[in-house]
Regions:
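Intrinsically disordered, low-complexity proline/glycine-rich segments
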Residues: 1-83
Length: 83
């Protein structure tokens, strides 16, 4: 299953992914990685709110790519628009 997180994908806290790879794309959208930024509507005080998990089997220049269910620093889960 392709469940990559990409720029603009949402979270279970109502936010979205706001930064992503400059080099890796899937289906026309930039792929999010560990360390990329997330906006969280429930926890705006968490700054920087970065993606803290990634799949080490899929990397972009050595940085693990985020997938469905991975989390950001505020605790929200990422939701892939591909599933």
């Amino acid at each position: 299953m392709i469940d990559l997180i990409r720029l603009g994908d949402t979270t279970d806290h109502g936010g979205s992914v706001i930064t992503a790879s400059q080099t890796m794309r899937y289906a026309g959208r930039r792929v999010a990685r560990e360390g990329d930024l997330v906006e969280c509507l429930l926890h705006p005080e968490v700054q920087p709110n970065i993606i803290i998990e990634g799949d080490r089997r899929i990397t972009d220049r050595g940085i693990p790519v985020a997938r469905q269910g991975h989390r950001a620093k505020c605790g929200c889960s990422l939701i892939s628009s591909l599933v």
